[in-house]
Amino acid sequence: MLLTHLHSDHIAELGDVLITSWVTNFAADPAPLPIIGPPGTAEVVEATLKAFGHDIGYRIAHHADLTTPPPIEVHEYTAGPAWDRDGVTIRVAPTDHRPVTPTIGFRIESDGASVVLAGDTVPCDSLDQLAAGADALVHTVIRKDIVTQIPQQRVKDICDYHSSVQEAAATANRAGVGTLVMTHYVPAIGPGQEEQWRALAATEFSGRIEVGNDLHRVEVHPRR
């Protein structure tokens, strides 16, 4: 599991993932679930397991083959290599989501293909470097032209530390990636509005543009 930062909308389902992956793993000696995130991740995981302590106890009491709490393996990073197993490498670099700090992005490489997960960030040099030449960049996007028209300042504040569609596309262009996969839309995309968002991205990026949603699948192949 990869966590870019510890905002609630990025970790709210953590408890369900920890418990469900544990209960539905029928291996005799299951390997720990690896979690990679920024500093603070171990504390959040520990607190989450504590919050679900009653549930964990119920399940151990109910199932004879569950005898210990969920096995978890937490790794905290701000930069550099984070994973090298089974032909998959993951590298981490800082992003800019201040005042949330630290925040990180991930570059995942396997079989010559590379995908970068930006998370929430404004444009920054470290993300450009992490994404350089990647086959795909998954980037969160917001419509600042819409959000700035909302009267509540607390809502407008989200423009401070997120990338607009055009900014995310410009990052993809500077980094020379093959495909931009947009995600984490603010406001939510209404039915039939997908092409509006794609057109905004196309003003800054001439490559393949995917309007991603949950469970959206994009095949990535090494570019020659």
Swiss-Prot record:
Xref: SUPFAM superfamilies: Metallo-hydrolase/oxidoreductase
List of residues binding Zn(2+): D120, H184
Enzyme superclass (EC): hydrolase
Reactions it catalyzes: Endonucleolytic cleavage of RNA, removing extra 3' nucleotides from tRNA precursor, generating 3' termini of tRNAs. A 3'-hydroxy group is left at the tRNA terminus and a 5'-phosphoryl group is left at the trailer molecule
Co-factor requirement: Zn(2+)
Keyword list, A-Z: Endonuclease, Hydrolase, Metal-binding, Nuclease, tRNA processing, Zinc
GO molecular function: 3'-tRNA processing endoribonuclease activity; metal ion binding
InterPro entries found in the cross-reference section: AtsA-like_MBL-fold (IPR044094), Metallo-B-lactamas (IPR001279), RibonucZ/Hydroxyglut_hydro (IPR036866)
Entry superkingdom: Bacteria
Annotated cofactor note: Binds 1 zinc ion.
EC number(s) reported in the record: 3.1.26.11
Pfam family, one: Lactamase_B_2
Subunit composition and interactions: Homodimer.
Function: Zinc phosphodiesterase, which displays some tRNA 3'-processing endonuclease activity. Probably involved in tRNA maturation, by removing a 3'-trailer from precursor tRNA.
Protein family membership: Belongs to the RNase Z family.
Name of the protein described by the UniProt record: Putative ribonuclease Z
Species name: Mycobacterium tuberculosis (strain CDC 1551 / Oshkosh)
